[in-house]
């Protein structure tokens, strides 16, 4: 069964209005000139092409974004829920972590309280936690670029930002690797990622077990006025296990971004 997209927007319905007598009047020469002018503008816009090294520029900007994010602490709140056939949650996994980077840029995570686990059919695996850490807030840095094939898919406005749309797929997946397969919406002005939508891969199948992963969407926003950091991840997908379909929903909120220096002491509010 195909996976559902994290966000589904119904197509707008076109409405055909009856033509009035005035509407049937032949256009004036001024109208024709305006139509021609707008046609030329539209043709110019359609002819706009991305730079041939778009992926490299994105990776360069992503490296700068990663370096900037390494100067911030933040809070990461995860909710992963099993849903029944009516969309009601039957079990959940909840956790809150404070994410801290040392002056050597080593990542440290501190659980805030104990995780809440009421899942009945699913369990959280090492791959799930690895994806929460590295794939859902995906950063395609220059040292990651070689892992991916990329293809330009057009342009689109998202979150009021004019974007190039870039598809990325793993060239190959080595044993134990977790990679991203999906679409990136890239700001045309600075090549920063505004939005990403896809899936952590590979899906894991064995004779005795299956480890399947939902499609997700991650939204970024400007945090420091210069770099876009992840602020929200959302997934609502149906996983096709051999013993039956299981709908899941996941949210990850990245909040409380605070820039720190070596001598800084960061204090977080209680959740």
Language model: regions and residue ranges:
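Structured extracytoplasmic
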Residues: 47-181, 188-194, 199-214, 222-225, ...
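Mature extracytoplasmic/luminal segments of secretory-pathway proteins
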Residues: 2-4, 37, 160
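Bacterial N-terminal signal peptides
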Residues: 31-42
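N-terminal secretory signal peptides that target proteins for export/translocation
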Residues: 1-30
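Extreme N-terminus of proteins, especially the signal/transit-peptide cleavage junction
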Residues: 24-26, 45-50
């Amino acid at each position: 069964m195909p996976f559902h997209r994290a966000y589904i927007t119904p197509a707008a319905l076109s409405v055909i209005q009856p033509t009035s007598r005035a509407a049937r009047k032949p256009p004036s020469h001024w109208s024709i000139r305006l139509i021609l002018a707008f046609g030329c503008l539209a043709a110019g816009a359609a002819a706009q092409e991305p730079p041939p090294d778009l992926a490299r520029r994105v990776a360069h900007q992503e490296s700068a974004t990663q370096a900037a994010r390494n100067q911030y602490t933040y809070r990461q709140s995860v909710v992963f829920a099993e849903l029944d056939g009516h969309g009601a949650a039957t079990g959940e996994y909840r956790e809150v972590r404070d994410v801290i980077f040392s002056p050597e840029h080593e990542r440290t995570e501190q659980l805030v309280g104990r995780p809440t686990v009421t899942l009945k059919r699913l369990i959280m695996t090492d791959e799930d936690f690895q994806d929460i850490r590295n794939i859902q807030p995906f950063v395609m840095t220059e040292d990651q670029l070689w892992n991916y094939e990329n293809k330009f898919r057009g342009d689109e406005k998202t979150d009021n930002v004019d974007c190039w749309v870039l598809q990325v797929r793993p060239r190959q997946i080595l044993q134990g690797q977790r990679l991203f397969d999906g679409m990136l919406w890239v700001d045309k002005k600075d090549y920063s990622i505004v939005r990403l939508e896809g899936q952590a891969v590979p899906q894991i199948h064995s004779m005795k077990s299956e480890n399947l992963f939902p499609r997700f969407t991650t939204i970024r926003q400007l945090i420091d006025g210069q770099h876009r950091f992840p602020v929200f991840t959302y997934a609502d997908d149906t996983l096709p296990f051999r013993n039956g379909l299981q709908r899941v929903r996941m949210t990850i909120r990245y909040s409380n971004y605070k820039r720190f220096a070596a001598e800084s002491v960061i204090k977080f509010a209680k959740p």
